[in-house]
């Protein structure tokens, strides 16, 4: 009997040993943390080798005078490190690939002036809940609203990447800022349904419809809205500025020559015509940064065999600028002189089209800046770029918004 038990134990040890040996291991590294520290349970082994499925609990602890900006884990992405962030502590990280773990802290003075509301869900047309964050100056009442739309090739990032801009735009206490998220193109959200550019635009209009419905809860005026965004968000903010007249229930390309957008969120009791008319009146300024404006540079991302170049024009601000006699939508455009993705000529083409339509437009080139200088991430390089180029031109943008919403008498 004892011999039998010994054999059984030996077999189990062999099986267990084989199972352990076959486990997939990944490298987990801890980033240097400034102005605070992180506590991780269980501890990361000295060699950084961690089994797939391991769950870490990370607690971020700021130094005196600082607050948590974000805890995160980062992985390699198409354009460098991609950050998965948590604005609260503790947070959990489940290991499924090589990754870095860290935290970013900022001076408390950066957020003392505002109330921040995270992750307000406005719709869920696919697998991903669509949400926005609100940055409201303390004591805000009936302030104009700024809606920020993030970039990332319509295929990455969330509203979190624009939080630096949101904080800056609220420092003078003149605006309530909403930073929105949207679906990613094709099936990059992990769903079975293909997401087209028209769907993404419907998310933008849905977010704005939800914001208009709830703006007063945060001290905002739903009848006075500005839109801004960078890169892909530059395109989408230009769409929001120039094309709310295309909101409708006629479908996008289903009928030849008809390209309309049904917002992914519709307020109860309102018709699509009401939402369209209210949004056309409310959106009064646009500040797209280093965006794509022409249909020749856009993709409709549709798998419909009927999709052709007219579908690209249907999502192109350049092809849909209203004449100022119909609707005024002043623009403030920015681009870095060393931007290798967005060319000066492409922005100038949009500027010329706005001028031809009688619209007011200001185009500012930022000397020495490359792409995405309005973004905010936990890494030192992005923060330094934001400080060097972003902060100043955000306040120049705010001066433009002030000229619309706080005109000199």
Question: What does each model-identified segment do?
Answer:
Residues 327, 332-335, 339:
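Short beta-strand/loop motif that positions the catalytic acidic residue
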